[in-house]
A protein has these predicted regions:
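Class I SAM-dependent methyltransferase SAM/SAH-binding core
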Residues: 67-126
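A short acidic, Gly/Pro-enriched loop at the edge of an enzyme's catalytic core
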Residues: 126-136
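A short SAM/SAH-binding and catalytic strip from SAM-dependent methyltransferases
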Residues: 134-150
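Acceptor-substrate binding/catalytic loop of class I
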Residues: 170-185, 213-229
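Short alpha-helix
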Residues: 220-244
């Protein structure tokens, strides 16, 4: 997701959503790897460098040394490799072949303890093995691509070993429900807060990092999921919620022209940021 305007909302059939989204991400993966926004040069130059997302997560993530982790919807692997640099043995899963190839190249160049597997997130347990992981990690901008949060929660539970932990930091569903930035600065709910059967369709020419690439695949199909729906899905899959923290910042300029860039790399509403939960961290464990 990125600092771009959502220009179109239509109701359509779900059937082809995965292929449409995959074409979009396949095209963007090499552009993202070449963009300063993903800081590939810093990963190569500094063996202790971590992504802004993972640095933000550190206080709640804690010590993960020696854990076996899987990062769902890992894209080009910068967060996955950051987790490996913290001492975990990581597996990244993504449905985009070009993204996985970029991630594998970065892992090889940096010597990170990270492997990458091409798979749809809903098929992740078949791709990497059930009950194998101490940690399931999911980062910003992942859940909006999934039509069923209940199915996702079942996948998470199947991946975790007994006693294993889910760690997710995501854009807040209240933020996802807001319309485009307005000159008057009002925050207006325009898109669904709750999961719907029908996707939202967005037609966006650009992407969320700086690039001169002109993209051909501009359509995406997306879904929002209410915070209660996410928690209920995890509880229904047999996990126990151990933590929920809402944050007043997010790692991208979600509302262009209405946010201030912080020294941490996070963005926050310039005017009365306490009006809106920007993101959240949710943690859960599987019974021992």
């Amino acid at each position: 997701m990125g600092a771009i305007a959502w220009s179109l909302w239509q109701i359509v059939a779900v059937n082809d959503y995965s292929e449409i989204n995959k074409a979009n991400w396949d095209e963007r993966a090499p552009a993202h790897a070449a963009s300063p926004g993903y800081a590939i040069d810093r990963f190569l130059a500094d063996p202790e460098f971590l992504s802004d997302v993972v640095r933000f997560d550190l206080p709640l993530l804690g010590d993960i040394r020696g854990l076996r982790g899987v990062h769902l919807q890992c894209h080009i692997g910068t967060d996955t490799i950051s987790l490996a640099r913290l001492g975990a043995s990581m597996t990244g899963v993504d449905f985009s072949g070009p993204a996985v190839r970029q991630a594998r190249a970065l892992a090889a160049q940096t010597g990170a303890d990270a492997t990458f597997v091409e798979s749809d997130v809903y098929e992740a347990a078949d791709a990497v093995g059930s009950g194998q992981f101490d940690l399931v990690f999911t980062g910003i901008g992942a859940l909006c691509w999934l039509p069923s949060i209940e199915r996702w929660a079942r996948v998470v539970a199947s991946l975790l070993r007994p006693g294993g932990r889910l760690f997710i930091r995501e854009g807040h569903p209240m933020l996802w429900s807001l319309g485009d930035s307005r000159p008057d600065g009002l925050l207006v709910v325009e898109y669904p807060y709750f999961e719907r059967d029908e996707p939202m369709i967005f037609d966006e020419a650009g992407t969320y990092v700086s690039t001169d690439v002109v993209f051909k695949h501009t359509l995406t199909h997306e879904w929002n999921h209410g915070l209660g729906e996410i928690i209920t899905a995890l509880l229904g899959s047999g996990l126990t919620i151990t933590g929920l923290t809402e944050h007043d910042s997010v790692p991208w300029e979600a509302l262009p022209g209405q946010m201030t860039l912080l020294s941490s790399g996070e963005w926050r509403l310039t005017d009365r940021p306490w009006r809106l939960p920007h993101s959240y961290t949710l943690q859960a464990v599987k019974a021992s």
